[in-house]
């Protein structure tokens, strides 16, 4: 767990003055004369390090337990383990992944309220004790199969203001919570805390206030029954990019006073959260290639002029990744993606109404329904930013189309910052590394050197 190794993943240092976007351009240039223009990702792990620093500035009392389901890349898990994060696992496989790199059981919460018996037994066998539940059936399953479990009661929230709602499936009401606590007492099961999740894409931060208040009620119920509850899990759903209605700090500015009111610092309660997309969404950029194109002329235009008819056309582009691959986020995560062109349009270039489709034989495989684009050609590239969350983790190989290749990069200052965090924790003052996103190459228009990154295999 103490080193990044090329045996684990291809990890490269960015040379000074270059950005992850430059690596995207370099990879495109490398295959420009080849027919093998496969889709690929470039992931900037420096962005993950910056997110970790930002987290503790905004939520200093809350320990992040990364939601592995969001993006289960081993490189991501390893990076976050070095930074000191915990892990929210939802299955035996995720627990195995996290423990395979040396993470201790104490840094894992099995945060799935509905677990298969064999997987409860597996958690018991490998020392994972913290796990969630929200029903009497689950309580009895755990009591029989994991006597040493430290249970966290998942309560329902008002997630009506969230894009991805979860309380329709998970969470106990306050009334049910008391009954579950009483039953746990009868079964001699240890209840150590409360968890909740307000849903992803929450647009009303006051939802957190009500959820924290409800959690306080359950803590008080537990105290009445003799439980020593000392863990509060405020869930996930925090935004991982800036193209959202409610920014991360707008949410945390509401959460912090609620935590101080209901769970003050001297209360003895440890507070954790389950961020997933927060850490990885903005670090991944996906590059796709146009593999086919269709021109649709509006036959109802009423014009006999060929030039007018050509100007009234719409364009359909087919690219080599789709909703059965990385863009499954459109179907399952309510994502709205926008293409970014690798070539800057000319000032007088005409734009056309365009749609973008994936490569499979399914008519459902549409990425963008309508977008104004200049006319592009087969072989041209499009980029999609903020593609790190709920994309590769749920991608399939339907129709035989393979998942995109992943390239991992990080700047040396971010690497050094990660090393410092590992050795000393989050420092009160950390260097401002925001300028590292500015690319000298892009600003100056210079051509990229043959290699703007070097391979890394460095102990930390």
Curated annotation (Swiss-Prot):
EC numbers for this chain: 4.1.1.17
Regulation: Inhibited by antizymes (AZs) in response to polyamine levels. AZs inhibit the assembly of the functional homodimer by binding to ODC monomers and targeting them for ubiquitin-independent proteolytic destruction by the 26S proteasome.
PTM-bearing positions, type Phosphoserine: 303
Active site: 361
UniProt source species: Xenopus laevis (African clawed frog)
One Pfam family named in its UniProt record: Orn_Arg_deC_N
Full protein name: Ornithine decarboxylase 1
Keyword Phosphoprotein appears in the UniProt entry: yes
Catalytic activity: L-ornithine + H(+) = putrescine + CO2
Site (Stacks against the aromatic ring of pyridoxal phosphate and stabilizes reaction intermediates): 197
Transmembrane segments: none
Keyword Phosphoprotein: yes
GO molecular function per UniProt: ornithine decarboxylase activity
Cofactor dependence: pyridoxal 5'-phosphate
Keywords, in A-Z order: Decarboxylase, Lyase, Phosphoprotein, Polyamine biosynthesis, Pyridoxal phosphate
Amino acids binding substrate: 332-333, 362
Entry binding sites for pyridoxal 5'-phosphate: 200, 237, 274-277, 390
């Amino acid at each position: 767990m103490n080193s990044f190794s090329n045996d684990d993943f291809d990890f490269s240092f960015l040379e000074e003055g270059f950005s992850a976007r430059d690596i995207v351009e370099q990879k495109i240039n490398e295959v420009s004369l080849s027919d093998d223009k496969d889709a690929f990702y470039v992931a900037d792990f420096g962005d993950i390090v910056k997110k970790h620093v930002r987290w503790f500035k905004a939520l200093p009392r809350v320990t992040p337990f990364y939601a592995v389901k969001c993006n289960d890349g081993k490189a991501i898990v390893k990076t976050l383990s070095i930074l000191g994060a915990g892990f929210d696992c939802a299955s035996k496989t995720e627990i195995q992944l996290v423990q395979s790199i040396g993470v201790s059981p104490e840094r894992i919460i099995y945060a799935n309220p509905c677990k298969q018996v064999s997987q409860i037994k597996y958690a018991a066998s490998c020392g994972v004790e913290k796990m969630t539940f929200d029903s009497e059936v689950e309580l009895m399953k755990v009591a029989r199969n994991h006597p040493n479990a430290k249970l966290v009661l998942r309560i329902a929230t008002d997630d009506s203001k969230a894009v991805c709602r979860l309380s329709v499936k998970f969470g106990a009401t306050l009334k049910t919570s008391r009954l579950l606590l009483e039953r746990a007492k009868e079964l001699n099961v240890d209840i150590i805390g409360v968890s909740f999740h307000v849903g992803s894409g929450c647009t009303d931060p006051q939802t957190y206030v009500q959820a924290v208040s409800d959690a306080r009620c359950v803590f008080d119920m537990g105290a009445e029954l003799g439980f020593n509850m000392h863990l509060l899990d405020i869930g996930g759903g925090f935004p991982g990019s800036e193209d959202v209605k409610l920014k991360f700090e707008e949410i945390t500015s509401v959460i912090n006073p609620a935590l101080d009111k209901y769970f003050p610092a001297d209360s003895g309660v440890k507070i954790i959260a389950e961020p997933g997309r927060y850490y990885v969404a903005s670090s991944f950029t996906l590059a796709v290639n146009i593999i086919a194109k269709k021109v649709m002329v509006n036959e109802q235009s009423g014009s006999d002029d060929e030039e007018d008819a050509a100007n009234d056309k719409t364009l359909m582009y087919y690219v080599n990744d789709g909703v059965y691959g990385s863009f499954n986020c459109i179907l399952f995560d309510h994502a709205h993606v926008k293409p970014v062109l690798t070539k800057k349009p000319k000032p007088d270039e005409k734009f056309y109404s365009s749609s973008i489709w994936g490569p499979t034989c399914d008519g459902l495989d549409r990425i963008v329904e309508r977008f104004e684009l200049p006319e592009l050609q087969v072989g041209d590239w499009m980029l999609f930013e903020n593609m790190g969350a709920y994309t590769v983790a749920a991608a399939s190989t339907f129709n035989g189309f393979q998942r995109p290749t992943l390239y991992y990069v990080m700047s040396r200052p971010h690497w050094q910052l990660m090393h410092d965090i590992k050795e000393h924790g989050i420092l009160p003052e950390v260097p401002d590394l925001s300028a590292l996103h500015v690319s000298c190459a892009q600003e100056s228009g210079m051509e990229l050197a043959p290699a703007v990154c070097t391979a890394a295999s460095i102990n930390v």
